[in-house]
């Protein structure tokens, strides 16, 4: 529909039926000298529920005086706010509050059991903001007026009560792509369903939901990662998102743009699923941008929004009468949904006239029949108490701590086994690098040159383990952060259960990789023979692999994206590398950097491996073949040259173990802080 196609001809307070020809008449000047009948909405729109019976499992959801503000981002606004706060503290100047945008303007509405309510409007009308505020899911920086009331069956509710009874399907589908649809639902059942249910009962519920949402054919298909791993189609992913929420059989379902990115066929199948849920007595609310005529017929009620205000609430049939009465009859060659959205849209280049028209429509609706009935009902229904203690959630989380840990551990272990880049490629990479280093330093002898080469090969052990494991951890962990943020905000599991489950599931891989590397490179290079020497070296290399893994966790938890983590990692690792004793003698470290050397795992591991290699090398074992070169007479001389002592080997093990614990605790704290900032 073009710009002229949006014109609604209302002149002299009389409604004029708008035909397709008049809408395309370029000579008309729309909205000029127009007025709106102040009583046009008296008899249009409905508030009556389809069923009078209401229980805790059959909910009427209503919101009253929903007033929402959002921060306006301005260039340099953070710096300006800081300057204003400093002036307020030290200069006794009044702090100027940041500008705010009025997102929702005293909106009220109601959705009943057994009906599908579609929230419609143009982009920026406030549809998603309405849903987020209704479901207590508003993002950081959004402020909701204290006068706002959200009710279930006439009882005011808080975020905890709403979470217990409402399922919220967001626009973006976030999954672990290496799982199948069935595995994903089993995990969701483990953390969502009540703790008194057995595992068998949860699996039976998963089977029932798979059948109800027609996921049987794809239940054993990988979910996949768009653009990387082929998996479920867009419609199947959306139905899987519904299935995740439907496991607990919630009486209220809120969906944000469920048809976004889908073709007309897939969109129709998704909305049909929601329609079936509403026919089972569920209260279903969804936002939709541009529904087809077939989709529009599935809606029981529509709520039209414009400029953050409610412009209409009622059935699609009543909407036809509503807009006809104000002189905006829908032409026969347009779908009603498109026409209503266009009528309530702000036309580029004609913002003043458009906003004036929208304001008049919304103002008149606010004093009409539906708004008056809602006002009266809210005054009658609001009660001081909620659902009562007997109906409140007994636990903050549905699953126990152990069940959360078990579920996360199971899912993380499946991800490790199924992720090709995490297992196959890493094992192949480790084997190739170990063979390459072994062949380059093949069969080193105890000579002057051999001593230098062995020391270099040992340091390569450390650098390879560090960069291979830290960067692998950064890549893997950050990709799950969006899923983690959403699931923790939905109170599916705690931060500590996720962190423990994730790290323990990946631990076997970080034990196999150093063993494989050491088993190949150690004998090829010809390092100190003996079972005790081999296992001492293996223990040190394994500790290095896990220190670097822990450091990778810390970087990934502290950074907001994979690209940022990959950019931050190398510059932070380099200082630790310099204090390893290979480039800079440990006795030459400046006093002001001494503290940093104690945080370097390169220092502890390099010292430990060199002690393991040279501590028991007696005088005469090193062959001196070059007379013009200083030749170390024994292993003790080599260690003294590097400022290492054989007695420090136990402290090297302790230092590496403490770094593992310290980095992981720091990573957990960073992860917890990130999760709390999102709440």
Curated annotation (Swiss-Prot):
This is Protein white. The keyword Glycoprotein applies. May be part of a membrane-spanning permease system necessary for the transport of pigment precursors into pigment cells responsible for eye color. Keywords: ATP-binding, Glycoprotein, Membrane, Nucleotide-binding, Pigment, Transmembrane, Transmembrane helix, Transport. InterPro entries: AAA+_ATPase, ABC2_TM, ABC_transporter-like_ATP-bd, ABC_transporter-like_CS, ABCG_dom, ABCG_transporters, P-loop_NTPase, Pigment_permease/Abcg. Residues 1-34 are annotated as: Disordered. It comes from Ceratitis capitata. SMART domains: AAA. Glycans are attached at residues 628, 643. Residues 15-34 have a biased composition (Polar residues). It is a multi-pass membrane protein. The gene is W. Signal peptide: none annotated. GO terms for cellular component: cytoplasmic vesicle membrane; plasma membrane.
